[in-house]
A protein has these predicted regions:
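Bacterial Sec-dependent N-terminal signal peptides
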Residues: 1-21
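Solvent-exposed residues in well-ordered beta-strands and their adjoining turns
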Residues: 12, 164-165, 262-264
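A generic secondary-structure signal for well-formed alpha-helical elements
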Residues: 12, 63, 67, 71, ...
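Secondary-structure boundary elements
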Residues: 20-116, 122
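Residues embedded in well-ordered secondary-structure elements
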Residues: 48, 150-152, 294
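Hydrophobic/aromatic-rich core segments of domains that either
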Residues: 122-199
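Alpha-helical and coiled-coil interaction segments, frequently adjacent to or embedded
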Residues: 182-319
Length: 319
């Protein structure tokens, strides 16, 4: 995966938010897998749920569990094939054409049940609006590869949604919730991750940076975003918190990485992998605020942190 709508290449597990929306999820899971048109899905959701947050959750659940990430389309977009470009004379014409484009993309996604990030976001927006809920597609940068550590976010490569619920904007990313690209099979596999539904903006910004900074819904500069480590899906779904180091770049002069992490449970195993060294090493968890990871004289490369064999975060070693 490269830069366009990259789905982080590891399993995204979910457990944190299950209780709040368990009943909604269970009901939506009994819905048909396909409909003749979106109105069929909208009608079911309208009949089953009254609260706007439940309606949005139902949309999110159905889209994330039925729309497959389209790796072929992603490859085409990366080389400039399949891009739709339109011209406009003024803002009014631009708004009209953008609305038409998003509606067409949403309908195409609904029928084919295949998409990259823009298709997921367009469908979430379209279905939410049909249910009377204000929703917007947000464009920006997804921090999804270790090479991005230290890089200022540039051209938009990802899309997600803002939905206006109970007087405030909430952030959701159905693309990251849908699943992952398996490194073993090099194909998409559904694996629902509910952590990206109504995520706290202070967490969401750890790997999302919008082109229009009003969609941060918090305070974070591009430089601060660039300096962050790379966080993976399990970091969010398991509600881990790395308190140190706050920077994603570790100096080789330190000759060690001192890790402080919250959220581990009794029996958890934390391992680390140094890109310039063979094999995994198990960390001593006697002091979770002071986990020492020796860098063994490394002057470059990456440190990957795993909990129970799931990757959590990566740091870069550089001056």
């Amino acid at each position: 995966m490269k830069t366009v709508c990259t789905v982080i290449l590891l399993v995204f597990y979910s457990s944190i938010f299950a209780q709040d929306y368990k009943a909604v999820d269970e009901k939506v899971d009994r819905y048909p897998g396909t409909f003749d048109n979106p109105n069929g899905l909208v009608t079911l959701i309208s009949a089953d749920f009254e609260r706007p947050e439940e309606k949005v959750r139902a949309v999110f659940r159905w889209v994330a569990t039925h729309v497959q990430y389209d790796m072929f389309l992603e490859a085409q977009v990366e080389v400039g094939i399949g891009l739709k470009v339109f011209s406009y004379k003024d803002q009014k014409e631009k708004d009209i054409k953008e609305k038409k484009f998003l509606e067409e993309l949403a309908l195409k996604t609904f029928v084919s049940q295949r998409a990259i990030c823009h298709g997921y976001a367009a469908l979430i927006e379209y279905l939410s609006l049909k249910l009377g809920i204000t929703a917007k597609t947000v464009l920006g940068t997804l921090k999804s590869s270790p090479e991005q550590i230290g890089m200022i976010p540039g051209k938009a490569d990802h899309a997600w949604n803002g939905v206006f619920i109970n007087g405030k904007w909430e952030l959701i990313d159905a693309t990251l919730a849908a699943g992952y690209i398996s490194e073993r099979t090099e194909s998409f596999e559904f694996h629902y991750n509910e952590a990206f539904f109504f995520m706290n903006p202070n967490r969401f910004v750890l790997n999302h940076y919008p082109t229009d900074e009003k969609w941060l819904l918090t305070q974070k500069s591009k430089k601060e975003f660039a300096d962050l480590p790379l966080f993976f899906g399990s970091y969010f779904s398991k509600n881990y918190r790395i308190n140190a180091p706050l920077s994603g770049t570790v100096s080789p002069a330190d000759n060690q990485l001192v890790l402080s992490i919250e959220g581990l449970e009794f029996g958890d195993v934390l391992q680390y992998f140094l890109s310039e060294r063979p094999g995994f090493e198990q960390a001593n968890l006697s002091d979770l605020s002071n986990i020492i990871i020796p860098l063994d004289g490394m002057h470059s490369g990456y440190v990957s942190i795993f909990v129970n064999k799931d990757i959590v975060a990566m740091f870069k070693i550089a001056e």
